[in-house]
């Protein structure tokens, strides 16, 4: 069977030496993961133990007024807490008691660490154990850190899911586990394709409700749908589950290779695979070709933001005809991203971590056609004449699998097209 995919490059980037940057960072903290997790996990509540700055970040990022009672909130540490003049643990217990009395629908409560709680060394792990014993079994209390001292942007989801894994029930069943939060419509598309291939049962982490939590054991195999889940990958492996390594499902090639790796694991025939994937694969290829017309032959520079960067570089270079100058990412997990790196032709700089001024110097020297960066860097670069793409949009917009492949290409082509229009208007 031919999947009608281009051959892999003679030499990929898996063994490329990585430039490690350890300087000033410009990136959101891990608290931002709560914005999509609280929508996904419908009987969970995320209680950030932090400052008013944390509360303002969450409220403005989510676009939700706090009186609407979303499934997140902030237990604000006051000056007396920071000065050690109050028993922060006793106050936290009282806040949790009040919250659970007012919101009896909560079945999972996450105590989320922040910069202030890390600075005063508030032991939220012990607090979660204490509160679980008090409020269980109706409510299970977890903890993870979203502190900007310890985490960047998408690491919040990784820390959250990694905190859940040790509590998942044990199972001997042969099951596929999809790991990573996706919009419901995209998750449904993935499960539908896998079901048509005859693969099942398919379980998801995170689950919508605590009662739907998947089991994990030595016969569990898991496929990641997000490349930033290194800690969750490790936690599942320690429970005996086995990872199905594959490129991530961005674009028609990434989606096809991701599905093919799972299909091979479950012994799906080539004929069945072709019958199920041929039509959506063709639609995705056509959509990407149309949306990426203005990208071909252009260069792209990724500043580190979300850990999606290597997978997206593979998509842009393989499916959209771009060339990558530098692929920067906050952390580079070769065990997870190796299959994507294998498909990026040798040449671009791979960098891990951030040193903003040095990386901006390299952007200015390279003069790429498109720079993918965080919100704080985009406007200054635009003022210097660079074309930029906000990296945050690639996290909050549905971009996985066949039906979103054209939309993904469009996210990159729109700023390039906008710049071309502005140049034409300026010349007239």
Swiss-Prot record:
It is an enzyme of class 1 (oxidoreductase). SUPFAM superfamilies: Helical backbone' metal receptor. The keyword Metal-binding applies. One of its GO terms (biological process) is photosynthesis, dark reaction. Gene3D superfamilies: Nitrogenase molybdenum iron protein domain (3.40.50.1980). Component of the dark-operative protochlorophyllide reductase (DPOR) that uses Mg-ATP and reduced ferredoxin to reduce ring D of protochlorophyllide (Pchlide) to form chlorophyllide a (Chlide). This reaction is light-independent. The NB-protein (BchN-BchB) is the catalytic component of the complex. This is Light-independent protochlorophyllide reductase subunit N.
């Amino acid at each position: 069977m031919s999947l009608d995919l281009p051959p892999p490059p003679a030499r990929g980037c898996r063994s490329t030496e990585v430039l490690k940057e350890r300087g000033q960072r410009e990136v959101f903290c891990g608290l931002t993961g709560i914005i999509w997790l609280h929508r996904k996990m419908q009987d969970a509540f995320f209680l950030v133990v932090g400052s008013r700055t944390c509360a303002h970040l969450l409220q403005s990022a989510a676009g939700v007024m706090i009186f609407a009672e979303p499934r997140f909130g902030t237990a604000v540490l006051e000056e007396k807490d920071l000065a050690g003049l109050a028993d922060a643990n006793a106050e936290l217990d009282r806040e949790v008691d009040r919250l659970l009395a007012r919101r009896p629908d909560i079945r999972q409560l996450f105590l989320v660490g922040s910069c202030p709680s890390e600075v005063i060394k508030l032991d939220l792990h012990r607090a979660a154990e204490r509160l679980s014993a008090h409020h269980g079994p109706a409510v299970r209390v977890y903890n993870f850190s979203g502190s900007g001292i310890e985490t960047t942007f998408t690491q919040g989801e990784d820390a959250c899911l990694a905190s859940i894994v040790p509590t998942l029930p044990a199972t001997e069943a042969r099951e596929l586990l999809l790991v990573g939060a996706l919009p419901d419509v995209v998750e449904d598309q993935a499960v539908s394709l896998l079901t048509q291939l005859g693969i099942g049962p398919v379980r998801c982490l995170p689950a919508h409700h605590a009662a739907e939590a998947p089991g994990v054991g030595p016969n569990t195999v898991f496929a990641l749908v997000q490349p930033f889940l290194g800690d969750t990958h490790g936690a599942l492996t320690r429970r005996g589950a086995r990872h199905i390594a594959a490129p991530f499902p961005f674009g028609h090639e990434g989606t096809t290779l991701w599905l093919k790796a799972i299909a091979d694991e479950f012994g799906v025939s080539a004929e069945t695979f072709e019958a199920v994937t041929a039509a959506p694969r063709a639609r995705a290829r056509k959509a990407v070709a149309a949306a990426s017309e203005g990208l071909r032959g252009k260069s792209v520079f990724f500043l580190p933001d979300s850990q999606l960067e290597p997978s997206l570089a593979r998509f842009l270079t393989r499916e959209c005809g771009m060339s990558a100058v530098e692929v920067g990412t906050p952390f580079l997990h070769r065990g997870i991203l190796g299959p994507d790196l294998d498909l990026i032709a040798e040449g671009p700089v791979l960098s891990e971590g951030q040193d903003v001024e040095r990386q901006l110097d390299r952007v200015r020297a390279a003069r790429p056609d498109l720079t993918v960066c965080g919100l704080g860097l985009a406007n200054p670069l635009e003022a210097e004449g660079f074309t930029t793409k906000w990296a945050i949009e690639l996290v909050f917009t549905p971009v996985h699998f066949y039906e979103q492949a054209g939309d993904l290409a469009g996210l990159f082509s729109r700023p390039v097209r906008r710049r071309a229009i502005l140049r034409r208007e300026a010349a007239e």
